[in-house]
Amino acid sequence: MNDLEFMDRAENLLKAVETSCDRINDQTLADIDSQRVGSMVTLVFSNKSQIVINLQKPLHEIWLAAKSGGYHYKFDNKQWLDTKGQGEFFANLSRCASEQAGCPLVLNS
């Protein structure tokens, strides 16, 4: 994958995260403040905990930082997969967000 393809796929992922947060805020009592600055999205929960998602263009990776730890993802044909075999990006983001929000949440593409 070249830089242009990476940025296109990565930007689509960040937009999907923001759209998922808007949907969750509209449909549930969860309150997720989604803040975008350049190639980074920060999700702030009502308990003030945060999840940070940012693009690592030189590595063609997306990094996710949550209370449970840090995760790195590379695009593999159709999805973003953890570089250490820990699963798919949106499944892990949903798990981390649910833990930090204290209620079940689903973020997806």
Curated annotation (Swiss-Prot):
Any one GO biological process: iron-sulfur cluster assembly
UniProt-listed SMART domains: Frataxin_Cyay
Superkingdom in the source lineage: Bacteria
Record-level GO cellular component terms: cytosol
Record PANTHER family: FRATAXIN (PTHR16821), FRATAXIN, MITOCHONDRIAL (PTHR16821:SF2)
Function as written in the Swiss-Prot or TrEMBL entry: Involved in iron-sulfur (Fe-S) cluster assembly. May act as a regulator of Fe-S biogenesis.
Tagged with keyword Iron: yes
One term of GO molecular function: ferric iron binding
Pfam families xrefs: Frataxin_Cyay
Family according to the record: Belongs to the frataxin family.
Annotated protein name in UniProt: Iron-sulfur cluster assembly protein CyaY
Keywords: Iron, Metal-binding
